[in-house]
């Protein structure tokens, strides 16, 4: 994207979250035995990596040129937060990819032990992001 304001940071974070959430949900399905989704999870990990890189690039551009804050609809302080959230979401995407690989290669045997933990982690991620998006930091 040549226009820095074409995708504001908040919108980019929401898009990244949708990708990561779908990846994580699919990785749980893979642990439950739906192996066909494994390649899709890996493909979406590449999308998540690119979007996280894009958010970092936007943030760095904003630090170099403070007038971009208005176009990106975020202050420098908010930019730091969005950058950190993007990094965390990308890391969750990496974990979803790993879960998908484990489920695909090993099948249900290890998945039985991992499944409740994976579902708990999914719930925590969803609640934290809901609080972040709704600007309720105490709940996040």
Over which residues does each language-model region extend?
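Cytosolic, long alpha-helical scaffolding segments
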Residues: 1-140
């Amino acid at each position: 994207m040549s226009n820095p304001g074409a995708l504001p940071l908040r919108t980019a974070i929401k898009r990244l979250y949708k990708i990561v959430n779908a990846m994580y949900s699919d990785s749980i399905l893979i642990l439950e035995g739906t192996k066909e989704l494994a390649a899709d999870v890996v493909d979406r990990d590449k999308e998540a990596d690119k979007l996280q890189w894009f958010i970092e690039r936007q943030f760095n551009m904003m630090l170099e040129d403070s007038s971009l804050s208005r176009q990106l609809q975020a202050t420098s302080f908010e930019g730091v937060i969005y950058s950190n959230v993007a990094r965390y979401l990308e890391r969750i995407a990496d974990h979803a990819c790993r879960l998908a690989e484990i489920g695909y290669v090993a099948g249900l045997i290890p998945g039985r032990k991992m499944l409740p933990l994976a579902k708990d982690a999914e719930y925590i991620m969803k609640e934290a992001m809901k609080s972040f998006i709704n600007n309720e930091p105490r709940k996040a």
